[in-house]
Amino acid sequence: MLTSDSLSRRHFMPLAAAAAASSPFVAQGAASQDGYLKGRLYKTLKIGMVKAGKSLEEKFALAKEAGFDGIELNTPGINVEEVNAAIKATGLPVDGSVNSSHWQVRHTDPDPAVRAKALESLKEALRQTHAVGGNTVLLVVGKGSDGPEEEIWKRSIENISKAIPLAAELGVPIAVENVWNQFCYDHEGDHNQTADKFVKYIDEFNSPWVGMQFDIGNHWKYGSMGDWIRQLNKRIIKLDLKGFSREMGKFTKIGEGDLDWADVRKALAEIKYAGWA
């Protein structure tokens, strides 16, 4: 999934189309040496990126015209009837959603009452996503500042696991995103870190209904994204994209910065990834 700064109506169409067509990751002519990725990636973006358009239908239409194949919403909180009407009118599907409360109401919170609210939010996100035809709910599991890693690891897995039966019933996987939340990596560490902890964390759920929505730009500061992709392998069920510059120490537009996109494409071909990005 492409991420970017806010776009006005005047700028949305040309910039979004350019991003969709010429990104070093999704560009049709820059797939991989053997061409494996060509035709296997579906471009999507978050609804919050589409600043132009007053109605949901207008936003969907703009995204489709810009060349995107799908769109992600924020759940819970959507009007299911309105979303389905926008899908029908534009032909643009909802490929998934982002659990809208996961930063504030966390599965790592030491308060059981807060974790119960986080669980209900996740369950409702799964229901609403299913109701509009989406196939994933992106989830940030919490924050490392909520306690020692061993404790938040255990409590988050226990809490999220309670939603797995519903995810399986609806056919909507829970997609854990790697973010700067001081969990499963060393936030003050160097750029030689691996995805070992993320692999272990996902595997402890022991369920095909929990995987990774891997953000390629988020952890370039901390390790080789190609190698992380190789480690995570089939645990990756969806991708998010952004650029990052180690030299400048900040996020960048896709194609800028120093992220090794060539190795990323090679790694994705090696694991035979196909799906949303």
Predicted regions and their residues:
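Acidic/histidine-rich catalytic cores of soluble enzymes
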Residues: 64, 161-258, 262-265, 270
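Substrate-binding cleft of secreted/luminal carbohydrate-active enzymes
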Residues: 275-276
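Surface-exposed cleft-lining segments at the edges of enzyme active sites
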Residues: 142-152, 181-190
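N-terminal pre-domain/capping segments
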Residues: 2-131, 135, 150, 161, ...
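Mobile beta-alpha loop/short-helix "lid" or hinge segments that flank ligand
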Residues: 132-144
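Short, hinge-like loop/turn segments at secondary-structure boundaries
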Residues: 88-91, 111-115, 155-156, 193-195, ...
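Generic structural signal for helix capping and beta-alpha/helix-loop junctions
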Residues: 80, 104, 146, 183-184, ...
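Conserved beta-strand edge residues that scaffold enzyme active sites
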Residues: 77-78, 100-101, 143-144, 180-182
